[in-house]
């Protein structure tokens, strides 16, 4: 066993979005930066390896296959295998490029191994039998979050209960799939596998699927996934999971309290992710954590150890790659700028569920706006009824709804819910308008390209009506 010591101006633990961007920016100033990553399969972070990029690649291929009309099992299996190959090539190329970009900085060093704090100023890196002690003026914790399996009796012991990470690696595709959790990840994977003919059953504990959206939007979304062959049960409580010889049984209580059984080939659990702090040695530092296990930070993302910052999912903020990127901007402002940026600056952060069509949202729902005391107008229209938006028809995606919640006194957009093809692009324009106080009338009267989904804003926003 060998032990060495190195010192850097900055050490980043975890090769994710915020950390890698910060490491590159810091190294470009001539500072010595170390990037510590425990797995070469995670260069670039969760997003490009097991998260956003590979899953959206699978969503894309699944949508293509569904549209092809080839629904026999042989074609479905071949298409799924092809999608997996495409995904792996894509993530492999992005992984290599991320390493290349980091190491193109002369003062940046990639260190493979597991990092564990010895104190506020020292980290021990272990790789096999080798150990390295690294000291730094500044540490960045960027370890992300990991999928968890809840303490359902039998679930953690089961060989057929998988996380989203594990399900992505599963080949051939299952013929029957149960999904526990009806949030964005659960809905996304339900859509992927149902497109290839897998019999998918979604179990959601909340009273209604898509319950955080307004009723009209939620109902439209539920109808769409039902028509795609996805069976969804809300208001359920999963009791036990039991492995069989070549299947797994989920025992649950339905919304009426009746005992039900679901037998499938595999179960994916999508009930949440937890901050990845295990094994970091936080007990050896002055870093405090929240009641949910996240690293506690202030509005500048500084931990309770003044020389240590935490970026991305590990700090308990919204678990989005683009939030991690903004975390980088906040910390860079502290280290190399005027210190003016903070997490308090964030407004109108959008999100998308990648179902087919995608469901994108930002700001307040109608329900939330009324509860907050706003006097509002609502502009809403089914996609099929928007005459001035032929783009949806040319793409053969005429289903969905576009809805806006508007402050009746100021004409400011308070929120939007867009269940429509390409909504993940349009929602960014809406969020930008909200952040910069552009009114609904200004968005309504703007000139947009044709045919596009964006031009639907002309027609939808022209039909705002008061709501009491």
What residue spans do the PLM features occupy?
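Glycine-rich Rossmann-fold phosphate-binding loop(s) that bind the pyrophosphate
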Residues: 14-17, 180-183, 213, 313
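Catalytic nucleophile loop
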Residues: 19, 183-186, 324
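Glycine-rich flavin
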Residues: 2-8, 17, 25-31, 36-173, ...
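Short hydrophobic core segments
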Residues: 11-13, 115, 133-144, 179-180, ...
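Flexible, glycine-rich terminal cap/loop adjacent to redox cofactors
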Residues: 13-41, 46, 53, 57-58, ...
